[in-house]
Amino acid sequence: HFIYVIASDGDVQEGVTSEASSLAGTQQLGNLIVFWDDNGISIEDQTEIAFNEDVVARYAAYGWQTLEVTGEDVEGILDAVERAQAETSRPTFIRLSSVIAYPAPTKMDTGASHGAALGAEEITGIKQALDFPDEPFPVEDNVLSHTRSLIERGAQAHEQWQGLFDAWAEKNPENKALFDRLYSRELPAGFDAEVPSWDAGESLATRKASEATLQALGKTLPELWGGSADLAGSTNTIIKGSPSFGPEAISTRNFSAEPGGRNLHFGIREHGMVAILNGIALHGPTRPYGATFLQFSDYARGAVRLGALMQSDVYHVWTHDSIGLGEDGPTHQPVEHL
């Protein structure tokens, strides 16, 4: 299936977008399709005062397929979507050139329409410009019948999908049982039987204890996967014996990548890492984790907070949580956190 994103001018300015988009290009996520609503307006009006880069060229450099179409070209948009769906080895970035609040008499193409209601006078002017009747929310019968036909079309699509799913379930009873367990969010009996324990007073670095626990859980929970922001060797969060996630083309001398791998490599992208983990968790049904030093959780805090608000089932592993670990100096010591 496909993942669709509708992004604004502000969204493509955010640093976390660059982090995630760069990694998506590296991962060759061919089922990711982003629409950029390029109207050149933000809260402070025209974006040129702060943002004038070639966004399409940037996404091409990330390794994305890039397409451009005007926002009013319905057939062009459909064609762009079909081209995006046909591209399986690259994510697709579709630039939609549009005019915000078109055709509002005085607020069209202005920051005044970015985050506030247009008001009665502007709405009346829009209806006059479009030759719409001066009544609230007029919807013609042919529009209603067309949109309501989606109910029947959706029912037919679901029936077809259900038949395919039932046939798969009958042929794959073990995978069907796993599917049911994952979507019920249940843990298997004895999942923690091999989790080690230590006597009080025994000397062991907490990240080593965490590593041993992760290895034990990794054996019984196939849904557990994740990685770190370029700190796997320090946070001890590699699932041993499992390949890395990604296309085979990104394999290196140290890591063998394949689409079914369980070790994620986020690069030095803490904010992007946690935002991606939120998306994985909300999509379901797996259990993703991400690791970094406690000090560097600051870089990810925006996504950590959103994950808490959304109650996304993400596991954060924050190591080096002591000022006693000081080889790298105060930049790496979580003084304020503690």
State where each predicted segment sits.
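Thiamine diphosphate
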Residues: 1-2, 148-338
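Glycine-rich ThDP/TPP pyrophosphate-binding loop and its adjacent helix/strand module
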Residues: 1-149, 338
